[in-house]
UniProtKB/Swiss-Prot annotation:
It is found in: Cell membrane. GO terms for biological process: amino acid transport; carnitine transmembrane transport; choline transport; glycine betaine transport. It comes from Bacillus subtilis (strain 168). It holds the Pfam family BPD_transp_1. One of its GO terms (cellular component) is ATP-binding cassette (ABC) transporter complex. Involved in a multicomponent binding-protein-dependent transport system for glycine betaine; probably responsible for the translocation of the substrate across the membrane. This is Glycine betaine transport system permease protein OpuAB. It is a multi-pass membrane protein. Residues 1-18, 66-69, 115-137, 237-242 are extracellular. The gene is opuAB. Residues 40-44, 91-93, 159-215, 264-282 are cytoplasmic. Belongs to the binding-protein-dependent transport system permease family. CysTW subfamily. The complex is composed of two ATP-binding proteins (OpuAA), two transmembrane proteins (OpuAB) and a solute-binding protein (OpuAC).
């Protein structure tokens, strides 16, 4: 039985990636240097603060934004991380996650706003987001390595690709959920598109957008172990090293540290959303 001719898709993609690397190598080097400097700046800045003082700051922030229970959990959890010897890797992980989330917000929210205002843009963006969310995370690492070499930068890039879709989707959803009668009222009073967006739609969509940002934070944090495979430092690197060297105890310790950070960030960002809601109802 004759087989259909094979489509050389892999060869085409490899040639395309090689062409981009050769043509825009300087551009990608600039991005890599900028991202690396930003991440290192966060790590250095947090590293100047004594671990005990920074733990108290995190606990106070959790108390102010969230609840006493979360503040106590943050205090005990971060002290445990410090006494286990994973303080510096935790700071590196926080820097990677923070950088990824900032980029996701800065890029994702405007795209979400644009897609909510233009149906054509939404139809184009939606399948791209589907691809970003369904593509295996390991696949993101391949072009990231080609363009940015080994280190923290490809980890950040892969995390951004994986974590950005919820921010875009929830921004679109939040703006679309604004009641039509409010939109009609603003139009009746002669509001411009910008006035309607910034004074009505975005304030009412804030809760939904924050929910998307919360999801992006969790997805970025879930990428730390995968990012470690391309040289990104942090708690993920500790877990990856423990797996490759069959050190179960070390892997469990680093895993506990990741869980503590994840729960802390999740509860704090969730309670930002709740406080926004309660103030709006007051």
């Amino acid at each position: 039985m004759d087989r259909l001719p094979r489509i050389p898709l892999a060869d085409i993609i490899d040639r395309f990636v090689d062409w981009i690397t050769m043509t825009f190598g300087g551009f990608f080097d600039g991005i890599a240097n900028g991202l690396a400097a930003f991440v290192n700046g966060i790590v250095t800045g947090l590293g100047f603060i004594p671990s005990i003082l920074l733990t108290i700051i995190f606990a106070a922030l959790a108390w102010w934004i969230s609840t006493r229970g979360i503040a106590l959990f943050t205090l005990i959890g971060f002290l445990l991380i410090d006494y286990l010897g994973y303080w510096d890797p935790m700071l590196q992980t926080l820097a990677l996650v923070l950088t990824s989330v900032i980029i996701s917000i800065v890029v994702g929210v405007p795209i979400g706003i644009w897609a909510s205002q233009k149906e054509t843009v939404r139809r184009i963006v939606t399948p791209i987001l589907d691809l970003m969310q369904t593509m295996p995370a390991f696949v993101y690492l391949l072009p990231a390595i080609f363009f940015f070499n080994i280190g923290v930068v490809p980890g950040v890039v892969a995390s951004v690709i994986f974590a950005m879709p919820p921010t875009i989707r929830m921004t679109v959803l939040g703006i679309k959920q604004v009641p039509a009668d409010l939109i009609e009222a603003t139009e009746a009073f002669g509001s411009t598109t910008a006035q309607r967006l910034f004074k009505v739609q975005l304030p009412l969509a804030t809760k939904t957008i924050l929910a998307g940002i919360n999801q992006s934070i969790m997805l970025a944090l879930s990428m730390v172990v995968i990012a470690a495979m391309v040289g990104a430092p942090g708690l993920g690197s500790e877990v990856y090293s423990a797996v490759t060297q069959l050190k179960t105890g070390v892997g469990v310790e680093a895993g506990i540290a990741i869980v503590i950070v994840a729960i802390t960030l999740d509860r704090i960002t969730q309670n930002i959303k709740v406080k926004k809601k309660s103030r709006g109802n007051a």
